[in-house]
């Protein structure tokens, strides 16, 4: 490098250090992109920009990656370590890649011809200052090359702190040389493919241009579906067409987002400051699969679980920092209050009412608006559960918005639509105390500014946050596999509701919930809560708690629930120390040692965190429970009993194992429990290992309350086979409340209406009850006895005595259909 160029770079570098603070995507490119630092690298940038090059250099040096300004010396040949594909924007939109870049590609490929062991890593890198997509109504001449430097100066000045350096997956030049050759044609193809890659990358990061709101409304009003709905509105309400049209516009105003890049930038500053003070870290996993989907041109629909109002902000914040466009978010109309409503609207929220029933105009306007978002290429986010979970478990999915998503596909859009399930987890949910009150019968407080201020004042140390992206579900692929004829229903004008739609929507919704749970995150809080709640006294010695944490960690590491599930990379001692810092537990010291206590007032709140990961530990807990209560049980008998119980667990906890594969699932769990010496295996019989019985009991407690609930329902059903489904749900809930009071069961979901509704629906699906006749008493009694053998004698006695009393109170039988 010449002397004057070194001076120029140094001066420019000084300015950039003052003005630029770039974020790297992914955060750790060496690990996430599997870069081999022992092999030569070759950086590829889209445009000739020294600012981009020096920004890249700064990040490379910070990450201990090779300096792009240094040359590569390979087999005596010296070549630059970077290349610009294009000179930059020109008057004409189409232009070929620089010949210099093609020549450099050719030189690098040529090196591989004479050196079979050489494998250079080509790394595409994009540097972006700001990500404003612009407006659809913006009409401007193509940027002149002369203005590029001036524009770059102002971009650095204004957006230097909002810049990103995005490293893409490496390309093996050895593979290219071996598979495609090393001639000039391949070099030109490499340059063209790189240009296309950067173009897609920019679209994924910036998104399509934003619409002019009024133009969008005019387009919606011109759609045939809304025109028909307006006419129906005028006729049914006996009002003029103009008035009906005004009603439609008012609904659009109520629903539509008013997304602005400036609001996103400002909120990023505020949220970065907020997260750094409230959270000790935000852990993100599997974001690369989402970036790849966006880059491949998929229309992405994010479907996260819903734990807190914080979910809206956290997911958008994470996506923005992963180099992706924040989505348009379906938010409950209850959040449309000042000032939250206008702020959320500018951050991409569009508002949805709790129910569409009885308002055809509203449902039509909403469906058309959602379809327009898809057709324009905006990513969308909605919560399949409909509302925030009050128990920490996933709720039964509400399928209305998903049905509209499939109907949008039936408009014949060109881009594939893919659902991305997202698990969001917290070590502290700010609304958890409110949830507990609501589950005890308190009226839900309406969202408002005073409530928001009170909530913000309570925010303190929130521990760690977790955002895990689950396995995507391509709607196109799903429909091709399950409904091969789905394209026959495509109609670009009218909303379609083919006969296969309801069943398909329900199946896809179930898969989404299962995939969310497959991406669950175990953490210090939910693991400690699981252990302490397993103790009937809600207290363990420090040694017992550490031993139990080790048991859970070993189980989840050696028999993972799912590949996407994540575990804390900490020792049990580190997890306990972190959990104690959250001030949820008390520590009492005596002459023997420390006692970790879960205070009574915290016990109900802690069930929320335990429930976040109950599905990950419920099968080991079931095995432990069977061994404890039977003292010894053959492997075959354990598998038989588990096969009876598992369908109910699967439906309630959205578990992913197929019932037919249960023996293959339980076998490694049994082996792991034997390895940990919690149980012993003698002549294919599982028996208790007395020295480790305390850990086995604590593990078994993870399924204790669930089995009690099942026993309640089967007790009622076997005593009265003709009881109606509605009465069975109601009586089960009443009996569960009684059991909770008599035996001090603190879990609020123990008598939750939705849990029993799911259980009764599962019994119908499994054939225990039906819509036209009685249940088979012998069958239900057999299953009750199976469950009762897994209960303590006092719990069993209470269930049987209270269920008999309940039946006597209702006259012994309910004549409704089962």
From Swiss-Prot:
State the compartments where it is located: Cell inner membrane
Q: What class of enzyme is it?
A: transferase
Identify the residue span(s) of motif HXXXXD motif.
305-310
One biological-process term from Gene Ontology?
A: fatty acid metabolic process
| Catalysed conversion reaction | sn-glycerol 3-phosphate + an acyl-CoA = a 1-acyl-sn-glycero-3-phosphate + CoA
Q: Pathway it acts in?
A: Phospholipid metabolism; CDP-diacylglycerol biosynthesis; CDP-diacylglycerol from sn-glycerol 3-phosphate: step 1/3
**How is this protein positioned relative to the membrane?**
Peripheral membrane protein
Q: What is written about domains in the entry's comments?
A: The HXXXXD motif is essential for acyltransferase activity and may constitute the binding site for the phosphate moiety of the glycerol-3-phosphate.
Q: What is this protein called?
A: Glycerol-3-phosphate acyltransferase
